[in-house]
A protein has these predicted regions:
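Hydrophobic, well-ordered beta-alpha structural blocks that scaffold small-molecule cofactor pockets
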Residues: 70-178
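Conserved S-adenosyl-L-methionine
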Residues: 53-63
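Generic beta-strand/beta-sheet core signal
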Residues: 14-17, 58, 127-129
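Short, contiguous acidic/charged loop-to-helix segments that flank catalytic cores in large enzymes
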Residues: 32-36, 102
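Conserved SAM-binding loop
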Residues: 1-26, 38-53, 73, 134-136, ...
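Extended, H/D-rich, highly charged conserved domains that either
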Residues: 35-39, 60
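Conserved ATP-utilizing enzyme core subdomain
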Residues: 60, 66-73
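Short glycine/proline- and charge-enriched loop/turn segments
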Residues: 26-32
Length: 178
């Protein structure tokens, strides 16, 4: 346990992504992060308490894509509540998670149908050869619809995506391909 690494005057600073917005917005690329846990502010703070850590200060910073929760904590001899949170107190989190999981197949079909329709109009280029693109291509099984993966990072150009064996091109290729 982390609280055993500190004396009673020591502090730990945690900074974690707030998964709430991503779940509510059906962002299915979120699991690429491979965290063991995906927290809302409430579940994060409860987890700290259950692990014998007292919150000195906390805040949430809102960003356009993913919000960040941070907390400065210190060891506590008193754990406010050793019991798990009652399910009834997590209605919002559970409802959001259920919708997130139930909507995936619908969203996947919508994405595939969109790419199938657009592919008939001509080649498709995906901008960005990062983890989000890999997740997007993989989770929605759309590699067969992607003709070009473009990225301005010179260290990526000429390499291949780990999904679909798609070569990564400099965005300038669009000028040549018209």
């Amino acid at each position: 346990k982390l609280n055993q690494l500190l004396n009673l005057n020591g502090c730990i600073v945690f900074e974690i992504p707030d998964s709430s917005k991503l779940v509510r917005n059906y962002d299915y690329t979120m699991p690429w992060e491979e965290h063991l846990y995906y927290y809302s502010p409430r579940t994060f703070f409860e987890s700290l308490n259950k692990n014998g850590l007292s919150i000195i200060f906390s805040n949430k910073i809102n960003y356009s894509y993913e919000d960040v929760i941070y907390a400065i904590v210190k060891p506590s001899k008193i754990i406010k509540n050793k019991n798990l949170l009652p399910v009834s107190t997590l209605k919002k989190e559970l409802s959001d998670a259920k919708k997130y999981s139930m909507y995936f197949e619908i969203k996947k079909k919508m994405v595939k149908d969109f790419f199938k329709k657009e592919r008939k109009k001509g080649p498709i280029a995906l901008f960005g050869a990062g983890h989000m693109s890999v997740s997007f291509i993989s989770f929605f099984n759309i590699s067969s619809y992607i003709d070009y993966v473009l990225d301005g990072n010179k260290n990526k150009i000429g390499l291949y995506m780990p999904i679909g064996n798609k070569k990564i091109y400099n965005p300038d290729i669009l000028k040549m391909k018209n």
